[in-house]
């Protein structure tokens, strides 16, 4: 089942950026693409294709990607992202996101990481859909950009797939990573109710720069099985407020153990 984020992303992009084109020309082109008498991906490679033909080509590509999200078409579409016009690229990103086409992860991540790209936000949102666990560190690294922070937070809450939880734990535990990236992961973990990161929080809370965010998250995510790690954290921290908060949390969890 397609995720809500993918559908909302695709819908918002399509609503905002679909050009007004000649309906008859669009319908005729789409019919040709669907019959196979013309190839939509080839039409998208042509710089002189009309707006109606390009839009029909995008819609045909989107349908094919949804039907076959692991087909070679994914690579062809991904290769176009950096060379086609911005509006077409946005529509193609939405198509890749809707199809959860993981084969496009590298190209989408590259766009999301490009500071001067007008595609940064749509690429970051698409990355949450296509990248799975691989998207987590890339998205977290973008959190330091205030212009992207809110979108990145939403994407981190929604990203799904095998290994995502482990990627959150690894990112929170990485003492060499930027504090903004680790804090973004912590906030998203709370949004996901990801209780399995509590152990990593108990370690990270010993770092002064991480203390407050970890403290707030532990109050929401810690459970009785984390008591040993919480006691260790309480002994290690020197901030009186945090030490007191952990002490109260420990007593609360001991009472329900």
Give residue spans per PLM region.
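Sec-dependent N-terminal signal peptides
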Residues: 3-12
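Amphipathic alpha-helices of TPR/Sel1-like and other helical repeat/solenoid scaffolds
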Residues: 39-47
